Structures are given as structure tokens and as C-alpha cells.
Amino acid sequence: MTNIRKSHPLLKIINKSFIDLPAPSNITSWWNFGSLLGICLMLQILTGLFLAMHYSSDTATAFNSVTHTCRDVNYGWVLRYLHANGASMFFICLYLHVGRGIYYGSYMYTETWNIGIILLFTVMATAFMGYVLPWGQMSFWGATVITNLLSAVPYIGTNLVEWIWGGFSVDKATLTRLFAFHFLLPFIISAMVMVHLLFLHETGSNNPMGIPSNMDMIPFHPYYTIKDILGLLLMIMVLLMLVLFSPDMLGDPDNYMPANPLSTPPHIKPEWYFLFAYAILRSIPNKLGGVVALVLSILILXXXPLLHTSKQRSMAFRPLSQCLFWLLVADLLTLTWIGGQPVEHPYIIIGQLASILYFSIIIVLMPITSIVENHMLKW
């Protein structure tokens, strides 16, 4: 008699995805972040669901409803800070996951990579909308500044912005619709994650050497289930340290002031995970140019398979490309720092140079370096 997990219509899907899935025997801890992202998504949906039960999406009561959740609801503060810092963990895992994909050439699985980019955009949109909901000063002004960027679209820009606002400024209608979309999008993300996995399981996982591993596969369970649980425990530990010891470390103190359309905060800036893109946006002294650069800073990932000129897939044995990769990481950290600084000398010029370097590394330097490495290996 066949094992029920292999014969039952539902269980066999789970079996083929998480139990009997053949996986390369040499994938490292950099491959843990996919499962961690799945856990983050589930955590965000659960905490978000319970927060939504106590939230009121009206400009008059939104700020107070969040305060009420923190003060009067049993463990409401835990829910709120798990959700806020869970978003930070989500983005840390996301950026490490994408970085792993770039380093080891996982982008050569184009379908998986492309839906991953769409997922990244969707998660960023969801996080932005979530940041508006507490209706503090930074929520309101962040929403005003970022939605206003759409007015840079030629001809239809102003109409587009007013259509999104539901009026002539960020107000009650805006908050209500952003709450609706913030609630809806994670479920769409969940569906897209399934498609992401579907495409991945068509090809199987990549591995650190970037070579086919069909001759050396091991079952996902127990080897990688145990490995994923270790990663999960470490992530939960870091998250709980954040939530229980310094829940506001990554937030902005301005958001503890109720939204006031009549007073602008001294420095409007998004959450830390958007600062690199915000720095790129600000480094171009033209509104439309800045918006284009902002979108391209993520969309450029779609070109990674087209810009791959190396005869090897992974960077594991390409020291010059490795140097460029870590330069790119350092550049992104620099941009993140600049995004949180005021617009004044010397931050302006540093941001502009870092932005130029970001695009140069990806579009020009990496493909050229790969060609040089091919010649060095006489390929």
C-alpha cells in the first residue's frame, strides 16, 4: 500500500514540495532565507489580522485606535511591535535572498527571478501602505510625499494623484483605501509566492557552485527541514530581542505625534528599508528623473539575466566579480545612510556618486569584469 502522503491529492502536493523534494546536497545557509520569508509572511498576516480587529481606518480615530491597541488590548503592544519589526525582518530576509540570487547566479532561472521581482515590488507597496495606517506625522507626510511623486507622470500626473487620494489632499478617503489594500495585498502575495515556488520546482534549486546537481540530490526532509528550523530559531530570537528590548529602534519618533497637515516634520524620511531607494530618488534634481531612477533601482534586477556575460553561473570562483559584488553591497549601505540624512552638503554629492556607482556596477562594470574573467581563464 502506498504511503498516504504520496497518494492523497492534497498531501502529495505538500510531499513533493517540502518532504520528498530532491535538493542539492551542498546548498548553504544562504538558501535558508526563502523559508524564513514564508514564515515572515505568515507572521505578518496573523499579527496583521489581529491588529485589524482593533484598528479604525478613520482619520479621527486611527491614531487613537493604535494607542488603544497598545495600552488596553491584552498583549496588543506585542502584536503591534511584532508586526512593525516583523516587517523589518521581512526586508532583511528579502534583501539577503535577492543578494544570494545575484551572487550565485540564481537569476538564470528567469521565470522564478521575474516573479520574485514582482513580489519585491508588491511587498514594498504593502509595507509603504502599512506605514501610513498609524496616522502619525511621518505616516501622513510620507504618504503625501510618495503619492505626490506620481504627479511627475506627464499629462495625467495631477489627475492620477487626486484619483489615488480620493480628494485634493491625503485625507480620510486615502487612509480608508490604503487600509483596504494593505489588508488585501498580503493574500495576493501569498498566491504569488506559490507561483514563485511552482517555477522554482520546475528547475530545482541552484547551488553555490552554479553547476547542475542532478547526480547528487538529497531529500528536503529531514536535512533541510532541520536546517530551516535552525535559521527560524535564530530569526525569531533576533525579532524577539527587537520587540521586547528596543521595539522603537527602527521606527521614527515623529510617528508618535498625531498627523497634522499644518506642520511639516523637519526631515521626512521613510522606514530604513526604503532609504536606499529614497536616496536614489533625491539624488536627481528633477522630479520625473528621480521617479524614473527610483523605479529603475529595483526594475534593474530584471536585466540581471541579460547582463550575465560570464561562462560561469556562480561568483564562487570569480574573485573580480566578488569584489564588485561587495562594492555594490557597500554602496547600498552608503545609500541607506544617505537616505536618512538631511539634504545638505556633503550628503548631496555623496548620494549622487553612490547612485551613479550603483547603476554603473550593475549595468557596466559587472558584465565587463565577467568578460575579463572569461579571457583570464582562456574561455
From Swiss-Prot:
Residues binding heme b b566: 97, 196
GO molecular function, one term: metal ion binding
Quaternary data: The cytochrome bc1 complex contains 11 subunits: 3 respiratory subunits (MT-CYB, CYC1 and UQCRFS1), 2 core proteins (UQCRC1 and UQCRC2) and 6 low-molecular weight proteins (UQCRH/QCR6, UQCRB/QCR7, UQCRQ/QCR8, UQCR10/QCR9, UQCR11/QCR10 and a cleavage product of UQCRFS1). This cytochrome bc1 complex then forms a dimer.
Source organism superkingdom: Eukaryota
GO biological process: mitochondrial electron transport, ubiquinol to cytochrome c
UniProt: a ubiquinone binding residues: 201
Cofactor annotation remark: Binds 2 heme b groups non-covalently.
Cross-referenced CDD domains: cytochrome_b_C, Cytochrome_b_N
Membrane topology note: Multi-pass membrane protein
Protein's name according to its UniProt entry: Cytochrome b
Job description of the protein: Component of the ubiquinol-cytochrome c reductase complex (complex III or cytochrome b-c1 complex) that is part of the mitochondrial respiratory chain. The b-c1 complex mediates electron transfer from ubiquinol to cytochrome c. Contributes to the generation of a proton gradient across the mitochondrial membrane that is then used for ATP synthesis.
Transmembrane segments: 33-53, 77-98, 113-133, 178-198, 226-246, 288-308, 320-340, 347-367
Keywords linked to the UniProt accession: Electron transport, Heme, Iron, Membrane, Metal-binding, Mitochondrion, Mitochondrion inner membrane, Respiratory chain, Transmembrane, Transmembrane helix, Transport, Ubiquinone
One Gene Ontology CC term in the entry: respiratory chain complex III
Further details from the record: Heme 1 (or BL or b562) is low-potential and absorbs at about 562 nm, and heme 2 (or BH or b566) is high-potential and absorbs at about 566 nm.
Signal peptide, first to last residue: none
Species of the source: Myotis welwitschii
Source taxonomy: Eukaryota, Metazoa, Chordata, Craniata, Vertebrata
Cofactor: heme b
